[in-house]
């Protein structure tokens, strides 16, 4: 097992398990501090302003701009990240350490969202993993993944399953691993992100959360019985079709099996991190997509996006999962 080494910051003291990782964090996180086997380790450490000042100077003079102005690979292999002037990160070249610094006062939930989402995805990829942009629920003991771009309805559909008694495994970022000749889906933070009006309509009028973006999206903590905290075998992947314009939406639920080639393309398009595009990562990404496409069914799911149609969509998915899982 690789050990996190942070030469310029104190050794993290708190250990958490998320996404199959052991996270050694200098920040207290509102998640269980469990122990046991893990896929890899990442240290989450506080960064002094001087460390980031040096990185910003390098980023400004760097000739490598393919990642854009807020994400720059530095000469020593580290990656400098900044999001919306809210927080900045330095991800070590080997992905073992994520150094973080909030740039302005914000809620812990907002900071955790960036730290455990976008920033952590760089560490994952540097350690050889390729996280998917997916939300996953557990149905009858198997993991069912919903893939799709932001705004396609992954979290809304998953919330409908949570409301009906199924557990959420992860929202937005999915890490898979090969275990006992099958793919295992690993749990993320026990929370879901929804717009307030959708949260109240799907989860109930008393639901509460904390706004994290200018678009008013909320982080909603889920109770113990609403989540699953251990790895679950992945049984099927649904790729959500693009929502149709008003007046042109489909009238029924359609589930169509994708060919292995189509599945590979869909899995590649729905990577969580679209920024890292070096040749080594792209080769691993193709191998990963091929492995997933050959291991589980990948299907295209189209349906009307009206909230009152969610029970019908849920029933169609339950019937399909039952046929596959037996």
Describe the residue ranges of each PLM region:
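Conserved lysine of the Walker
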Residues: 154
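Glycine-rich, often acidic-flanked micro-motifs
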Residues: 2-34, 135, 139-149, 163-326
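Generic structural signal for well-ordered secondary structure
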Residues: 74, 112-113, 282
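Phenylalanine-focused residue identity feature
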Residues: 52, 80, 89, 111, ...
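Post-Walker A alpha-helix
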Residues: 157-158
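Extreme N-terminal, non-catalytic leader segments
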Residues: 82-143
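Long, basic/Gly/Ser/Thr-rich N-terminal segments
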Residues: 1-107, 315-326
